[in-house]
From Swiss-Prot:
The lineage of its organism: Eukaryota, Metazoa, Chordata, Craniata, Vertebrata. This is DnaJ homolog subfamily B member 9. InterPro entries: DnaJ_domain (IPR001623), DnaJ_domain_CS (IPR018253), Hsp70_co-chaperone_J-domain (IPR051948), J_dom_sf (IPR036869). SUPFAM superfamilies: Chaperone J-domain. The modification Phosphoserine is found at residue 133. Not N-glycosylated. Disruption phenotype: Perinatal death in approximately half of knockout mice. Death is caused by fetal growth restriction, reduced hepatic glycogen stores and hypoglycemia. Surviving adult mice display constitutive endoplasmic reticulum stress in multiple cells and tissues. Elevated endoplasmic reticulum stress in pancreatic beta cells is associated with beta cell loss, hypoinsulinemia and glucose intolerance Conditional knockout mice lacking Dnajb9 in bone marrow show impaired hematopoiesis: the number of myeloid cells is increased, while the number of erythroid and B lymphoid cells is reduced. Gene3D superfamilies: DnaJ domain. The keyword Acyltransferase does not apply.
Amino acid sequence: MATPQSVFVFAICILMITELILASKSYYDILGVPKSASERQIKKAFHKLAMKYHPDKNKSPDAEAKFREIAEAYETLSDANSRKEYDTIGHSAFTNGKGQRGNGSPFEQSFNFNFDDLFKDFNFFGQNQNTRSKKHFENHFHTRQDGSSRQRHHFQEFSFGGGLFDDMFEDMEKMFSFSGFDTTNRHTVQTENRFHGSSKHCRTVTQRRGNMVTTYTDCSGQ
């Protein structure tokens, strides 16, 4: 027969186990989306939370940990295969298995693109914070910058090594309605400058083929 003390201990253990289970949020809970969320909903939720909790924008002590948690959730749910596995085996089994497989943090991925242009064009955190924000992202994602010049005024090439920012740039092109953009994979922005009485027309051309994005300025004058 169970004693009152053993029953009490058993009840305490059940409560502790329940609290641990509830404390372990799913990736859907972290992003604030339902399990049936579409790819688009997941992208929007990630972008909103990443902007809110980025340590250069949010000064709370737990902002960086929250930012990493958000990125980890998005990394999994934005990939169809990873999301399917996650939904099948559950949060605990997936995260434990992920550590054993050596996938590590999403911040260990390698990204090759120019952060100066990123913060200059989209001005995430204000003009006075561009440099600090750029360095913070570089430190998190182990970014290697690589720029090259061509005869067409300037040429920059970005090679996306992972999927974390690939979708972000795609959505940003739609978010910021630059004049002259179309809905194809080839986007142009046209500007006009006059030098010493002559007319010079310049356009910035951005081309995307797969994971490779190239940008250059093409000018023609009379």
